[in-house]
C-alpha cells in the first residue's frame, strides 16, 4: 500500500501514465514507420509513455474523464486538421492542470529538479498544493497555476531557418515531439509539456506577467483558436533546445537501427507517407 500522489489516501496504486496513452497511440498510428523512439535513447523503440505507481483508482477515474473530453473535443479534431477553433468548458483547464500536476509531482518526488535552486523549492511545493486542491475540487480556481495552451502548426520563415535550425527540423519538433520538463531560470520556473501539435505551459513561479497573457485557458470555459501569440524568450529557447536535442538524437541512431527505419519506410505506401503529418511538416517547409 502506498499513498496516492493526488488525494494522499492509502490505496493500492495503479500504474498511471504520466502523459496519457492516447498521445503515444496517435503518434504511432500517424507515423510512417509505425514506431516511436525516445529521445534519450533513440535506439530503443518505445510504444508507450512513462508509467509509474501514482494514483488511486478514484483519482485515476477523475483524470480519465477530463482526458476523454480533451481527446474527443480538441485533440483528435485538431491533429486531423478537421477543426481549428474550439469552444471549451471547465474540463479543459482541469485536464491541463492534471498534466501539469503529474509532471511536476514526478519531477519533485524523483528528485529531477536539479536545475532548481534550493531556495526556489518552496514555490514547487506550493504549486503542487494549489494544483492538487484545484483538481480535487477544494478550490474552484488553480490560483497562480493557471494553464496555458498553445496550438502549434508548421512555422514558415523567410530564411528557411528557425532559431538557427532548419525549418523542416523545427517543424518536425513543433508538430510531432512528445516531451515534458520543469524549466527554471533566474526569473521563472515553469512546467513545459509538448505533445504533437500542442504546447502546455504552467507557471510555478514567475517574476513578471510579461509574456504570460496570451494563450491563457479560462478555468470556466472559452474559445480556443490559433492566433498571434506572445511567448517569453525563455519559452521559445526551450522549444529550440528541444528541437536541437531531437536532431542530435536522430543523428546518434546506430547504423543497424537506421537500416530498420529505412526498411520500414520503404515498405510503406507512398500515399501514407505523403499524408502523414511528418511528411506534411517537411513538405510544407521551404528547407
Ligand atoms: Zn487518490
Language-model region placement:
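Glycine-rich loops and low-complexity Gly/Arg-rich segments
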Residues: 39-40, 80-82, 225-227
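An N-terminal structural lobe/cap that precedes and organizes the functional/catalytic core
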Residues: 1-70
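Catalytic cores of phosphodiester-bond-cleaving enzymes
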Residues: 43-114
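C-terminal, charged low-complexity interaction regions
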Residues: 119-287
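A general structural signal for short secondary-structure junctions and capping/turn motifs
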Residues: 5, 11, 45-48, 86, ...
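Flexible coil/linker segments and helix-coil junctions enriched in charged and small residues
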Residues: 32-35, 116-121
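Short C-terminal domain-edge/linker segments immediately following a structured domain
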Residues: 36, 85-90, 230-236
Amino acid at each position: 500500500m502506498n499513498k496516492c500522489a493526488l488525494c494522499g489516501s492509502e490505496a493500492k496504486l495503479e500504474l498511471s501514465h504520466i502523459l496519457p496513452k492516447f498521445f503515444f497511440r496517435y503518434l504511432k498510428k500517424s507515423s510512417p514507420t509505425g514506431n516511436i523512439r525516445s529521445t534519450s535513447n533513440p535506439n530503443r523503440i518505445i510504444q508507450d509513455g512513462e508509467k509509474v505507481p501514482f494514483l488511486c483508482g478514484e483519482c485515476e477515474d477523475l483524470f480519465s474523464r477530463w482526458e476523454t473530453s480533451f481527446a474527443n473535443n480538441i485533440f483528435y479534431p485538431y491533429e486531423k486538421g478537421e477543426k481549428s477553433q474550439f469552444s471549451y468548458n471547465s474540463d479543459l483547464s482541469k485536464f491541463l492542470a492534471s498534466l501539469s500536476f503529474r509532471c511536476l509531482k514526478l519531477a519533485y518526488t524523483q528528485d529531477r529538479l536539479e536545475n532548481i535552486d534550493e531556495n526556489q523549492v518552496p514555490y514547487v511545493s506550493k504549486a503542487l498544493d494549489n494544483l492538487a486542491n484545484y483538481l480535487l475540487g477544494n478550490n474552484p480556481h488553480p490560483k497562480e497555476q493557471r494553464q496555458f495552451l498553445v496550438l502549434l502548426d508548421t512555422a514558415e520563415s523567410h530564411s528557411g531557418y528557425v532559431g538557427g535550425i532548419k525549418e523542416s527540423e523545427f517543424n518536425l519538433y513543433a508538430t510531432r515531439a512528445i516531451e515534458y520538463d520543469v524549466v527554471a531560470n533566474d526569473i521563472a520556473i515553469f512546467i513545459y509539456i509538448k505533445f504533437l501539435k500542442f504546447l502546455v505551459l504552467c507557471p510555478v513561479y514567475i517574476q513578471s506577467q510579461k509574456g504570460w497573457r496570451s494563450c491563457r485557458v479560462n478555468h470556466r470555459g472559452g474559445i480556443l483558436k490559433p492566433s498571434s501569440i506572445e511567448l517569453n524568450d525563455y519559452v521559445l529557447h526551450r522549444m529550440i533546445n528541444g528541437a536541437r536535442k531531437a536532431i542530435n538524437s536522430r543523428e546518434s541512431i546506430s547504423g543497424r537501427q537506421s537500416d530498420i527505419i529505412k526498411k520500414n519506410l520503404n515498405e510503406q505506401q507512398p500515399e501514407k507517407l505523403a499524408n502523414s503529418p511528418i511528411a506534411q511538416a517537411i513538405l510544407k517547409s521551404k528547407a
